[in-house]
Regions:
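Conserved acidic donor-binding segment of nucleotide-sugar-dependent glycosyltransferases
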Residues: 338-345, 353-358
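Donor nucleotide-sugar binding/catalytic pocket of nucleotide-sugar-dependent glycosyltransferases
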Residues: 131-132, 139, 158-211
Length: 407
C-alpha cells in the first residue's frame, strides 16, 4: 500500500505517547513493505529530534515548524470559530497546501490521520479511504483535567475546551471513512456506535522491556515513569508525593522512590526536591531504570486511553499498583496481574504490602509479563490494523471498478 500519514508531532521512538505510536506504526509498515509518506508538524516544544530514524522508515517526509506564537494565534482564532483549541493550535497553512499537493501527486491508496488534531487537513472526501486514528477520548481526558487541576484558570480553560471537544469528536468521526480508538471505554466516551470504529490498542516492545535475570532486592526502589512535563504526569507526581508516599515512608522508613522521565517541569523538580526522592531526568533507557525496581506505580487521575508506563512495567515483570484510570482499557485482572487502588490510603497500603512480600510481588510480576506477551505486543495489534487497512483499500478499489463499469 501507498499510505499518506499525517501526525501532529514528528514521530519519535522514545517521545510522547502519540510520537511513539506513529513511529512504531511506520516501523511496522516499512518492515511489511508498504510505502509511507509522512507529513508532520514540529511543534514549539522541540519534541521529535531523531528525524533521521524516521526518514529511514518513509519514502518521503515533510516537516513543518509550528511555533508557539503561531499555535496560540491559530488556536484562539479557531476556538472563537467553534473548533477545539488543540485542533486550531495544530493548523498550519503550509502543511495544508502540502497535503493537498501530495493527494494529487501521490494518489495514495490510504490516508491515515493521527489524532483529531490532524483531522481538518483531510476532512473533505478523498479518492483514497481515510482513517482517523482518534486513539483516546480527548473529552474524557479534558473532563478529568477540569476536575483535578489545582489552578483555577487551568480548570476554566479545560472546561471550555471540553465543551468544544465533546461536540467535535463525534462530528469529525462521522466525516471519515474509518475511525480507530484504543479501547471500548474511549469509544463509549466519545459516543461512537460499536460497529463504526476499529479498536487498535497500543503495544509494548517486549524485547526492550523484559524481566531481568536477577530479581530486584526487597529494598529496591518503587518507580514512577513518564514524560514529566505533561499535565497527566505532573498531577500524578503531585498525588504520589503529597498523599501516597508519606504514608509508605511512615510504615517502611527504608523504602525508596525513583521518578524517571524526560523534561521534568519546574513544579516536578520542586516537588521531588521537597520530598527528598530520586529523580532521573532525560534518561536514555526507561527499561534500564526499571531493572532494579521492586514495584511500579501509576497513580493517575487525569488520563484517557492506555497508559504506556503500565504496559512497560508489566512487560518488565514488575508488580504494578495503579488507579482505575491508569488500568482503563488494559484488561489486566486486579489482584492477579496488577494491583488496583482507588484511594491514596489504599494505594499506599498496596505498595507497603508488595514491598513487604517479595514472593507475592514476584508472582504478580510473572503473571503480568505473561499477560503482556499474550495481548500487548505491537506486532499483535499492528497486524490486525494492517488487515483492516488492506480490506479498506480493496473495498475502495472495487467501488471504483463498479462505478466505471456502470458508465
Amino acid at each position: 500500500m501507498k499510505i499518506l500519514v499525517l501526525a501532529s508531532r514528528v514521530p519519535d521512538r522514545d517521545g510522547r505517547a502519540d510520537q511513539r505510536t506513529v513511529f512504531r506504526l511506520l516501523e511496522f509498515l516499512a518492515q511489511r513493505g508498504h510505502e509511507c509518506h509522512l507529513v508532520a508538524l514540529a511543534p514549539w516544544d522541540g519534541a521529535g529530534n531523531d528525524r533521521d530514524s524516521v526518514a529511514e522508515l518513509c519514502a518521503t517526509m515533510r516537516i513543518f515548524p509550528q511555533g508557539r506564537v503561531r499555535a496560540a494565534f491559530t488556536g484562539l482564532t479557531c476556538r472563537l470559530a467553534g473548533y477545539p483549541f488543540q485542533v486550531g493550535a495544530m493548523w498550519n497553512q503550509e502543511m495544508a497546501r502540502a497535503v493537498g499537493r501530495l493527494l494529487n501527486e501521490l494518489e495514495p491508496d490510504l490516508v491515515y490521520a493521527h489524532l483529531i488534531r490532524t483531522a481538518e487537513y483531510v476532512r473533505e472526501k478523498t479518492a483514497a479511504p481515510r482513517i482517523l486514528a482518534m486513539q483516546v477520548a480527548q473529552s474524557l481526558n479534558l473532563d478529568r483535567m477540569a476536575r483535578h487541576r489545582q489552578n483555577l484558570l487551568s480548570r476554566m480553560f479545560y472546561r471550555l475546551e471540553l465543551a468544544a471537544v465533546s461536540r467535535y469528536e463525534p462530528a469529525i468521526a462521522s466525516s471519515f471513512d474509518f475511525n480507530t480508538v484504543i479501547s471500548t471505554h474511549d469509544r463509549d466516551a466519545i459516543g461512537l456506535p460499536a460497529g463504526s470504529v476499529w479498536l487498535v490498542p497500543h503495544g509494548v516492545d517486549t524485547h526492550e522491556f523484559h524481566p531481568r535475570e536477577q530479581e530486584a532486592e526487597a529494598t529496591g526502589p518503587v518507580i514512577f515513569s513518564g514524560m514529566l512535563d505533561t499535565p497527566t504526569n505532573v498531577e500524578a507526581v503531585r498525588l504520589l508525593l503529597s498523599e501516597i508516599w508519606p504514608r509508605v515512608i511512615a510504615r517502611l522508613p527504608w523504602a525508596q522512590l525513583r521518578i524517571v522521565g524526560r523534561n521534568p517541569s519546574p513544579s516536578v523538580r520542586r516537588m521531588v526536591r521537597r520530598a527528598g526522592v530520586e529523580l532521573r531526568a532525560s534518561v536514555q533507557s526507561i527499561a534500564e531504570c526499571m531493572a532494579d525496581a521492586a514495584v511500579a506505580v501509576a497513580p493517575m487521575r487525569i488520563a484517557a486511553g492506555l497508559q504506556n508506563k503500565v504496559l512497560e512495567a508489566m512487560a518488565s515483570g514488575l508488580a504494578v499498583v495503579a488507579t482505575p484510570e491508569a488500568l482503563e482499557g488494559i484488561g489486566a485482572r486486579a489482584g492477579t496481574e496488577a494491583v488496583l487502588a482507588s484511594s491514596s490510603a489504599r494505594f499506599a497500603e498496596a505498595v507497603v504490602r508488595l514491598l513487604s512480600d517479595p514472593e507475592r510481588r514476584r508472582a504478580i510480576g510473572r503473571r503480568a509479563r505473561a499477560f503482556i506477551e499474550r495481548e500487548w505486543t505491537w506486532e499483535h495489534h499492528w497486524r490486525r490494523l494492517e488487515g483492516r487497512m488492506l480490506m479498506a483499500v480493496a473495498s475502495a478499489g472495487q467501488s471504483q471498478t463498479d462505478t466505471r463499469a456502470r458508465f
